[in-house]
Each structure stands twice: as structure tokens, then as C-alpha cells.
Amino acid sequence: MSLGLYLHIPYCFSKCRYCDFYSHPGERGVPDAYVEALVRELDRFAPERPLQPDTLYFGGGTPSLLRPEQAKRLIDAARPLPGAEITLEANPETVTEQSLAGFREAGVNRISFGVQSARDTQLRTLGRPHTAKQAKAAFAAARRAGFANISGDIMLALPHYTEAEFDETLELIEDGGATHISAYLLKIEPDSAFGKHPPEGLPTGDEAADFYLYAVGQLEHHGYRQYEISNFAKPGYEGRHNLIYWDCGDYLGLGPAAHSCMGGRRFYYPPDTAAFLNDAAAPVMDGSCGAEDYLILQLRLRKGLSLDAYKQLYGKEFSTAQLAFVQNCVRAGYASFDGHTLALTPAGLIVQNSILAQLL
């Protein structure tokens, strides 16, 4: 079975106003002691043989604050399988052609840039520290450094949002050579700066849904095939790491606030970097991964839920009432169903939570 490895890098220049992830703003680099703490945990989970993950994902925080030699130290400790996908999230303002070439030499073969918008005024509203010019330069530097697998993030339904802003951002990312795009609706998290002081000019729920459908159409038109609610790729460039999550595979997350599911059991590290550094943060068990998780995660994917696999894995079948509800969804344009596979359309993905409430 495939194994995905996630390494959390909780350091960043500044906290974006929409972000509620566990991180430490005001940092200009990653302490070597933190890297060694991650190596310690890698050794702990694989005392007799290396983990050899199929995918390795550096998330954050801002993982591009790592020095290339630190990334190499972690990759060497994990010993990923030949052909593994190794992704590094990066903020455009933190990279140079030299640093990107160093990451490439260290073993990183996929880079993911947090672009969000091509408009500097919007970036300032979001609290992003980069400019559109820096985003363009980062894509160009990544290509020159030898990256052929490049992803870019777009945020939708931002304050005073327009379709023109989306088009400008898509153009920047596509012209940059992106093979993959993640497009997310802005979500106001209670513990974020936006949660405490919401920005003016936010779209209504209906307007946000329209922006989402517009984005899906434009991305598909430009050759980025939708394979998950928020993810689009050129053929063959789907993000393998996140597919392990959505297909309910095994994944190990290391670092404060990192979550895992191994052998059907969930656990996580407490969000406490000091305790993690001092080897005083044992993982906390957090229940099991079961049939409900499988249904929820599979219906995020455009390929949908195989009812045959659902029955084979969990012994579950849809009831007569559930099947009747599915047919109602098909008639409403929210889903397709051939008797074996239930898949949500883009319109259905927008109201996925309401659909799941009837199926669970």
C-alpha cells in the first residue's frame, strides 16, 4: 500500500490574514534543531528499516524557508522510493533561482507556489508578503532550475472579487508553466485575522458559487482537468500526495499539529513546537478511519464513489432511501450515477456538505 509522508514546517515570515494553521510568524529560516527533531521522529517510526514513502510533502508554514541542505537532510532520512513525488510548498518572495536549483538537487521534484491573486492590492488585503511581479519571477526561476512539475494556488471569492481578477491570476500561473492548479474559495476561519476582523466586500454565498463554477469552466477550457473539488491538473500531473488522503491510504504527518492515519488509526502531534523540539510531544490517538471517511473523501473526487468498492472494503450498501436521494441529485444536476459509481458534478461539489448530510 502507498505511504504518504507529510513534514510540517511551522515557520513563516508573517501570518496571512485568512490563515489559522499552526505556525510561527516573524521567522527568516528554519532552526537546524527543528530539522533534527523531524529526523528523530522519522527514525522513531522506522527503527529497523526506512519508511520509503511514495510521496513526501513539505507543508507549512513556509517550507521554502528551509535551506536546500536541510531539505536534503530530511529527504535522505526518509529515503523515498524511486520515482516518489516530493513536493515543497513555496512563497514566491522566499525563493531564488539558486535556492530552487538547490531544492531540485536535494531531491524535490514538485514545487507549489502560493500565488492566490495577480493583483497587488488584493495580495495586501490578504496579508500576502509577495507581489505579482515576484510570483512571475518565481515561476520563471523554477523552470530555469529544472522543475517540470509546478503547481500554483488561486483563492476565489475574495473581497470585491471579479471574474477578471480570476482570469488575470490564471494567466499569470498558466504563463508560468504550471502543470497543476489548486483553486480554493476563501473561507473565513474564526481563529484567523479575517475571523476577528472580516474584510469588506465579500461576495454572497450565491456569488461565491458562481465564481467557483466560472473558475471550473475556465480551468477546464485551458486544459486543467478537475479531479477534486479544488484541484485541477494537466493530464498526468495530478497531485499524488493528496490523492493518498482522498483514497484513504496511509499517511504519516510529522511535526507539531501534523495529523496521520496509519493502519486505520488516526493520531496527531500536539500543536506545541517547544515540546516537539524537546521530545516531549507524544502523538495523541484520535479514533479510526472508517466507512464515513471513505464516503466523504471519495465524493470530493470527480471520479466519485464506487459502491462496489464501498461494499467490498466496509460491507456497506446504500439503502433504498439513499438511492432515491441519489436519483434526486441526478435529476437536479448535482450528480451522475450509473448504478455502480456516484460522482458529483461541479454544481454538486458546491453543495457537497448538504448531500453528505443525507447520505451519512
Predicted regions located by residue number:
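C-terminal scaffold of the Radical SAM
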Residues: 2, 23-47, 54-316, 337
